Amino acid sequence: MQGLMQDVPLTINHLFDRVERYHGHKEIITATAGGLERTTYAEFARRTRQLAGVLDTLGISADGRVATFAWNTARHLELYFAAPCTGRVLHTLNIRLFPEQLTYIVNHADDEVIFVDRSILALLAPLLHTFTNLKHLVLMDDGKGDIPDDLGGHALLDYEELIAAEEPIDFPEITDERRAASMCYTSGTTGNPKGVVYTHRSTFMHTAGAMMVDSLGVREADVILPVVPMFHANAWGLAHAAVATGATLVMPGADLSGPALANLIVDENVTVAAGVPTIWMAVLPELKGRDTSSLRSIPCGGSAVPRSLSEAYREQTGLPILQAWGMTETSPIASVCQLDVDQQELSIDEQADLRTQVGRISFGVEARVVEPGSTNPVSWDGEASGELQCRGNWIASDYYDDPRSRESFTDDGWLKTGDVATVDARGRIRLVDRTKDLIKSGGEWISSVELENEIMSHPKVAEAAVVGIVHPKWGEAALACVVRTDDSLTEEAVIAHLEGKIAKWQMPKGIVWIDEVPKTSVGKFSKKTLRDDHADLFMNQ
């Protein structure tokens, strides 16, 4: 027997229609070099429809790729909807990729137009002559930045002039919910980045997921500050969820410094502020003594959240960090560490320990932790570890035009995340490490993440990254690369701090002091850089 329910395509157009119809009075605030710019969703909707006309006038193909090289701004939000709502594909370019990687992804995706912020045009200009399919270059003036003389032969069109020349148009009907809506390439830490193509359906479902109370719980009453870039994994879905619900949006623009973000949180009464751990390390001291009572959630992902950082926020603001997990291939939210109701009655220390997990897998997503090289599940005892795999309504099924897809997906359709994890009796997941970052020393496995968390709990440590490098006795050994807040901190003091917290064989065999932990294009620790920099350290001792 078949059901008798309507089957309406799940499209991004529905999100746009709701904010246009119901929430036109709500605000979008953008921080610029010249101060705050305020607009409404009504104005956003009108301009987005004008921008749709711009794409037609420029002759962008019916399913053409519309690239952005931009910060989090109201203009970028207009592009987030104008492209997919007209059937085209938004391609957000990660501004922190290496030049050769940018050339690769622009050409691989066949981008026809790039919309670029003036403040970062100089980063893109030297590469313009390498883009083989690019037809148009459009400047979005965010208040500062020189305009290079050499633009690879491309005329520089002005965003505002293009908008002003168009009347708002109706969007075409999107009848196929599986039509491509946007694409984002992975950070490419090994080899060329891989393209993930999101559909209207997957984006709709992920947006609904972000609105669930056991996820991020985005709602109309929220004031959302997405510090996580719109050029990376859909800004964790916050831009779409804000539009769907009519939540106020606070866009940080180019200035992601601790003081600037703290001012936005306090001055705009932000309720949800989302970013990677390094962002929250910089913001914390800037919030000291200030009114942060508006905050209800601080989602954090991209890398493991140190227990000490989450607890520092709880002690200072009354609100611990909300750890979430995902990746470009998962749209990206796949789990959120909300505590169960009975766990909220546990001691402060016990709750803090639980918050170092990434939580239970999100509704709409399935997960399994399997033994290496098999589909055999590990025990749900919180101890046995294996590879975390997932599948679901907003999980990638393949990479765009890439033969490497077979390496990342199982024969039965699950995504191999590359994360090593444990799962407890309640299905709560703890990430042990990335597969490539586990350290095998003297035949025993060492989790670099666990070591980092313990080292970063020392009050004189700002950041710490642990890598495995070749050792003459142990084959491989842990090296801790540490950023101190106080130069009086010694190697002996760090080792003493670790005693009793980890086993002796897990101790780092060396500590090096560094000024800053190198980061990848998405703000994660670049352990490959550290391994390369210190590859022979133990062999030369």
Task: Give residue spans per PLM region.
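Conserved AMP-binding/adenylation subdomain of ANL enzymes
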Residues: 204-223, 233-271, 286
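Structural core segment of the AMP-binding/adenylate-forming
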Residues: 15, 57-58, 85-164, 269, ...
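Adenylate-forming
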Residues: 71, 116-126, 143, 228, ...
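N-lobe entry segment of adenylate-forming
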Residues: 1-58, 62, 86, 143-144, ...
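Conserved adenylate-forming
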Residues: 55-60, 166-179, 183-225, 237, ...
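Conserved AMP-binding/adenylate-forming
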Residues: 298, 305-324, 328-429, 434-438, ...
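AMP-binding/adenylate-forming catalytic core of the ANL superfamily
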Residues: 68, 97, 103, 114-116, ...
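Conserved AMP-binding/adenylate-forming core of the ANL superfamily
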Residues: 28-73, 77-81, 98-103, 155-161
